[in-house]
């Protein structure tokens, strides 16, 4: 095996190691993020419980003080989340360049990145992540601001609604009892919802339930950490003198057909299925909340069959299964495609 072949094989092995490290980083980061939000929800519940009166209810007169305490805790949550995100981004970018270094491959070669060059690529990828403007016009800082606003609004609204409705329900119940009438079940439910226990439950659901700020934070965390890794890796491997491009890989956890199936199989440049010659043509990442990767393809890996198999996007679509086309195009467009 030639020296070049040994280096290329080492880069391939190191790429797999980096992907495994990224899988671990993703799992550990999301677990820690979930714990941050769950602990915050528990702390909020304790503060609400402390504000409950002798009857266990939070009085209307205490509402503003409770909200001030809640907002303080949410700000602390935001700071902890941002620190976790920044740490994840830095590690992901480092994992991205590691397969292109002597430290990552265990071999010496002028074709690999120096430590200084690897650090520069990592830093550039981090700047890219922060400056990147998505199709919806938002940058990372905008998404973080939206996360904070969502948490503040959902938690505040849950508390305000419970306290205000509970206050009115208590007054109405007193009037009914004074007239010797029974309290309707609906009114009793509103009174119970205004108890410190009821409010704590509502707050926990608002902060950590389905579609909650925690869910959105986990989505953001995975998306941006994966982006930092991929951008660093692509920039690093395309600097290798023998790189032909990068291959778009389907995630092992790919749940159902979508646009990724097309990107991973189309041979648009005669380099082989899913191989793209540069960053501009590579469609990775195909969508948010994905844990997916690309891998380097070297020039000597390109076969005559790859070159002869160059195809158009329409030809690539035609090769997909009907189910895959539905995932890529949507049901109606896929049906229209079938009729052509």
Named regions from a protein language model:
Residues 201-308:
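Acidic, glycine-rich two-metal-ion catalytic cores of nucleic acid-processing enzymes
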Residues 1-203, 298-340:
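N-terminal leader/targeting and assembly helices and adjacent pre-domain segments
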């Amino acid at each position: 095996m030639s020296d070049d072949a040994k280096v290329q094989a080492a880069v391939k092995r190191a790429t797999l190691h980096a992907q495994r490290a990224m899988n671990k980083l993703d799992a550990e980061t999301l677990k820690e993020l979930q714990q941050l939000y769950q602990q915050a929800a528990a702390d909020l519940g304790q503060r609400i419980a402390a504000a409950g009166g002798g009857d266990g209810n939070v009085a209307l007169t205490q509402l503003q003080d409770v909200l001030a305490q809640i907002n303080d805790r949410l700000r602390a949550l935001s700071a902890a989340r941002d620190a976790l995100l920044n740490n994840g981004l830095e590690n992901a970018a480092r994992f991205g360049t590691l397969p292109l270094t002597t430290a990552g491959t265990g071999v010496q070669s002028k074709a690999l990145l120096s430590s200084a060059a690897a650090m520069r690529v990592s830093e550039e990828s981090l700047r890219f992540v922060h400056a990147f403007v998505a199709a919806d016009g938002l940058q990372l800082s905008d998404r973080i601001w939206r996360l904070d606003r969502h948490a503040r609004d959902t938690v505040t609204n849950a508390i305000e609604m419970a306290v205000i409705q509970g206050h009115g329900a208590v007054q109405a119940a007193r009037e009914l009892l004074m007239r010797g009438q029974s309290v309707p079940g609906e009114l009793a439910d509103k009174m119970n919802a205004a108890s410190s226990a009821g409010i704590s439950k509502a707050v926990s659901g608002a902060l950590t339930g389905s579609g909650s700020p925690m869910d959105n934070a986990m989505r953001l965390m995975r998306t941006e950490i994966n982006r930092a890794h991929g951008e660093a890796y692509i920039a690093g491997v395309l600097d290798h003198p023998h790189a032909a491009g990068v291959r778009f890989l389907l995630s092992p956890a790919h749940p159902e057909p979508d646009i990724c199936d097309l990107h991973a199989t189309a041979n648009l440049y005669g380099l082989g299925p899913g191989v793209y010659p540069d960053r501009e043509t590579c469609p990775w990442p195909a969508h948010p909340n994905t844990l997916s990767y690309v891998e380097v393809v070297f020039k000597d890996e390109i076969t005559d069959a790859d070159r002869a198999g160059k195809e158009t996007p329409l030809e690539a679509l035609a090769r997909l299964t009907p189910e895959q086309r539905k995932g890529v195009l949507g049901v109606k467009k896929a049906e229209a495609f079938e009729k052509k």
